[in-house]
Amino acid sequence: MPKAPKQQPPEPEWIGDGESTSPSDKVVKKGKKDKKIKKTFFEELAVEDKQAGEEEKVLKEKEQQQQQQQQQQKKKRDTRKGRRKKDVDDDGEEKELMERLKKLSVPTSDEEDEVPAPKPRGGKKTKGGNVFAALIQDQSEEEEEEEKHPPKPAKPEKNRINKAVSEEQQPALKGKKGKEEKSKGKAKPQNKFAALDNEEEDKEEEIIKEKEPPKQGKEKAKKAEQGSEEEGEGEEEEEEGGESKADDPYAHLSKKEKKKLKKQMEYERQVASLKAANAAENDFSVSQAEMSSRQAMLENASDIKLEKFSISAHGKELFVNADLYIVAGRRYGLVGPNGKGKTTLLKHIANRALSIPPNIDVLLCEQEVVADETPAVQAVLRADTKRLKLLEEERRLQGQLEQGDDTAAERLEKVYEELRATGAAAAEAKARRILAGLGFDPEMQNRPTQKFSGGWRMRVSLARALFMEPTLLMLDEPTNHLDLNAVIWLNNYLQGWRKTLLIVSHDQGFLDDVCTDIIHLDAQRLHYYRGNYMTFKKMYQQKQKELLKQYEKQEKKLKELKAGGKSTKQAEKQTKEALTRKQQKCRRKNQDEESQEAPELLKRPKEYTVRFTFPDPPPLSPPVLGLHGVTFGYQGQKPLFKNLDFGIDMDSRICIVGPNGVGKSTLLLLLTGKLTPTHGEMRKNHRLKIGFFNQQYAEQLRMEETPTEYLQRGFNLPYQDARKCLGRFGLESHAHTIQICKLSGGQKARVVFAELACREPDVLILDEPTNNLDIESIDALGEAINEYKGAVIVVSHDARLITETNCQLWVVEEQSVSQIDGDFEDYKREVLEALGEVMVSRPRE
């Protein structure tokens, strides 16, 4: 606070009271007048016949001056430390000071005549003591107490340096309160930065303890010296009017405080570098809006409500201010183009990188079970750890009862009740039912997991997840590792799922049957639609039409403004202002809260379109392809087929179905000539060209080449024609010149489809072609098959592809191939009945 100018100094209260001045003036007062007053004061003290009334008056005035001096010194000390006291003359402190002075004060006697000489400027304290010496000692102790318990400022400091210093002083606290706060802070460090903070505080406290002088010695001398120096320089600071302090933000800091500030800034730099290193090591970054008080109250709710979260991967933003809403008991399908972050979102939910309510147990089925000696059924049962603990306790208590310990009977009864409540008796039957539905026969259910392939171990993992029934079950492409029969069972089983479900799938038929809601990932946001995938598709198409109309209307308005003489910038600004007014009007009408996001000009809605095309073949006389009297079996195994006899024409549309392991893929290899029959022969037209899509398609690609180079080398195509062919099958232009080994599974599949088209086949033989394709690409494949004039033989677990292409169903069973009478719904019913399941007929929403 600036002081009055030197020309009109405030008159000190002690001027003119030479007769009643106290000895404290020798220590506290300043200037040449001080010395004169001190001299007069000693002369007055020498008079031994002082009246008793004058002595009492001196004591009263002495107490008043002490209070004034205390206030002045405290104010200077607060100014020096960057503090501001809201109420300097606190009533409680005054009473305490008065009581202390009364205790310390002594009547006029010989002791008072032994007043020590004033302290020299060097700060060396002379021996002896009186009322004022005791007061100075108390003041130094109060300063120590204030350093231990700094008073809370009434108003926050504007200078951030002061704030940093006050924060830096906290680790040096040595009082009871400081110890309690320190112990609380050390109890549970949240992360490595918090632990580093605690370590830094400990180091600072040790440094301060080492450098701290004795309380009764150097510290008091130092403080007295600082006080006298500041008082001596006070008049010069008044002349400057506080300008130097305003210019220099560090002017009010002592050397000790500057040293602490330097240490604090160095610590902050270390923390910042650690955070930067941590961010560089992690590929993903997540941010989320702070939860409101209402959301915090609903932490135990069964629903999930996450607002304004963002996720980026490898520097690419996947979600920006997106909202996630999941209602308990509903079954959600998460859809969107490949590579936009669907799987990433599931992993962040499972890892609780997002704020999921703690009472919701989350399970993401993504890893296959460990390959060991554990039978498949036991691997499923062991997932329920609670049941295992209860069974172990049951055995222990039964052993105690057999030994005559009757005290275990009561606890054993409670264990039985818990086992009944969890359905422990039916646990094994439930596990075997799930395994059977996923394609495990009784012998396979008891087979050790180490004897299964990766795909079958993935099925065991899926069975464990279904057996556990978590509050929120998340499945990422669950049908990829399943055959058609297992997909039919899983589809039917999940329609009766009573808990919350979140599925990522490219199987439109699966989403139509299972899901009650669709979450669409589009433009880094999540959009919600009630109903199954078919309902979503209709609503989304309508929404895109409306957006296109609004965009065209906006472009028309911009064109009119430009024609009227407005620049492009001015026209866009005026259009944005009109959008803002319209947005505010809608908010007032709907009584919505104001959005902080400024309206942006509409962009043309992007239609994600993929179109597959296969060139039409020339006509060939039937039969173009067939197996006659074929028997085949792998060496050392029983035959898969016996006496196969059938032919295929140019207009054939055949889907081969059956459980895994019966030989569907083997049958396709026999038709392509890649396998030679044990008996019989494969016959084909001599002009026939076969296009074969193998589900192990990566083996036929040259990984070191780019897609463009691969097609150019194989078919002698010009550069532009090769790129056009890749573009027709939905491969992005930037991927045309990237090495095939760096492409995703879906991108590699598109390269193989482009290669098939370049071969101009007469017959398409496709083994699980929908793996790694998104829904739009599967639709495009179905349309291409329908338009294709040649024969098509497909093995697929995608029900919609089968039904959309009107394929005849040929089932492989009992070493033979036979055609099914009826459609796909009849086949589904037949599969479920064979498993002892009842077909669920869910009404479409």
Curated annotation (Swiss-Prot):
Domain of life: Eukaryota
Subunit structure: Isoform 2 interacts (via N-terminus) with EIF2S1; the interaction is independent of its phosphorylated status. Isoform 2 associates (via both ABC transporter domains) with the ribosomes.
Residues of the ABC transporter domain: 304-548, 625-840
Gene: ABCF1
Keywords for the protein's UniProt record, in alphabetical order: Activator, ATP-binding, Cytoplasm, Nucleotide-binding, Nucleus, Phosphoprotein, Repeat
Signal peptide residue numbers: none
Native species: Homo sapiens (Human)
Matching InterPro entries: AAA+_ATPase (IPR003593), ABC_transporter-like_ATP-bd (IPR003439), ABC_transporter-like_CS (IPR017871), ABCF_EF3_subfamily (IPR050611), P-loop_NTPase (IPR027417)
Reported function: Isoform 2 is required for efficient Cap- and IRES-mediated mRNA translation initiation. Isoform 2 is not involved in the ribosome biogenesis.
Family as reported in the entry's similarity comment: Belongs to the ABC transporter superfamily. ABCF family. EF3 subfamily.
Glycoprotein keyword on record: no
Induction: By TNF in cultured synoviocytes.
Tagged with keyword Transferase: no
Any one GO cellular component localisation term in the record: membrane
Tissue-by-tissue expression: Ubiquitous.
Documented effect of changing E477Q: Does not inhibit ribosome binding. Reduces protein synthesis
Effect the entry attributes to changing E768Q: Does not inhibit ribosome binding. Reduces protein synthesis
Protein name per UniProt: ATP-binding cassette sub-family F member 1
Basic residues bias (residue ranges): 29-39, 73-85
